[in-house]
Design a protein with these regions (language model features):
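Alpha-helical segment of the N-proximal tetratricopeptide repeat
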Residues: 12-42, 52-55, 59, 89, ...
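Structural marker of alpha-solenoid helical repeat scaffolds
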Residues: 42, 76, 110, 144-148, ...
Length: 259
């Protein structure tokens, strides 16, 4: 009977964790919190559960809890690529770029074929003003994510946006084009493409890209940003009625955001 009790105790936290993962994937956050807490009550050093609790805490705007869970996870298992990666992401999102670098580099070493640690390192070096290193890392991230997918599209959008900031407009547009091929539902990709085409004077093709962006879910790029861009594009296309309509929508969206 002792071995049966031991087996039940061992399986218990794993079952709670698996249920928490399912709830998290289905965006049932209160249920996921309950399950992950149950897993950690039975197994306080369960690294995957600590990482999941940290991610849930981030959604709940509890950075103190997220940081504590991730540091506990790394203390329990310094070789956890997932824990190192999410600690780096945590610091990146807190704009603490110097602290983000070390765990992201560790995650990259632990999982050299994963594009995500390299991608976040690229954005971190970009934020710190190290353009040369950022360019190299963005290219590495792109090379590690060759398949057309929403993940590769996100990498290409960020890469293209960085190239745009460096004045490499044609290269930027090419990244945006490939991002759209990878994820036609990416609002950010269509917006960045519209912005690039507008800069290059291709207003006729920029307008439909901006209009397409407006039809997609608002995750990163806001409605206000797109309306402002389209207002300027339609002015250049000598379509004042459309320009005026988008300008009014830009003002309305901006007021809504400020409330």
């Amino acid at each position: 009977m002792i071995w049966l009790l031991a087996l039940q105790l061992a399986v218990g936290p794993a079952q709670h964790y698996e249920k928490a993962k399912q709830d998290f994937a289905q965006r049932k956050f209160p249920e996921a919190v309950s399950e992950v807490n149950a897993a950690l009550h039975e197994s306080p050093d369960m690294v995957p559960a600590l990482v999941l609790k940290a991610r849930l805490a981030t959604f709940a705007h509890r950075p103190d809890v997220a940081k504590s869970c991730l540091i506990t996870a790394i203390t329990a298992d310094p070789t956890s690529e997932e824990a190192q990666f999410f600690l780096g992401v945590f610091y990146y999102n807190q704009n603490d770029f110097k602290l983000a670098t070390s765990p992201l580099q560790t995650a990259q070493t632990l999982s050299p074929k994963s594009p995500l640690p390299v991608f976040y390192l690229a954005m971190t070096h970009e934020a710190m003003g190290d353009a040369t290193q950022a360019l190299d890392l963005y290219q590495q991230a792109e090379n590690l994510s060759p398949e057309k997918s929403p993940q590769s599209a996100s990498i290409l959008v960020a890469y293209g946006r960085f190239l745009f900031s460096l004045g490499r407009y044609k290269d930027s547009i090419e990244k945006d084009r490939r991002a759209i091929e990878g994820d036609a539902e990416s609002r950010d990709a269509h917006y960045e493409m519209a912005k690039g085409l507008d800069h290059e004077g291709d207003f006729k093709n920029a307008a439909p890209e901006g209009e397409r962006a407006l039809t997609l879910p608002e995750l990163g790029t806001s409605d206000a940003q797109i309306h402002f861009l389209l207002a300027n594009i339609y002015l250049k296309l000598k379509q004042p009625d459309l320009a005026k309509a988008h300008l009014e929508k830009f003002k309305a969206a901006s007021q809504t955001t400020r409330r």
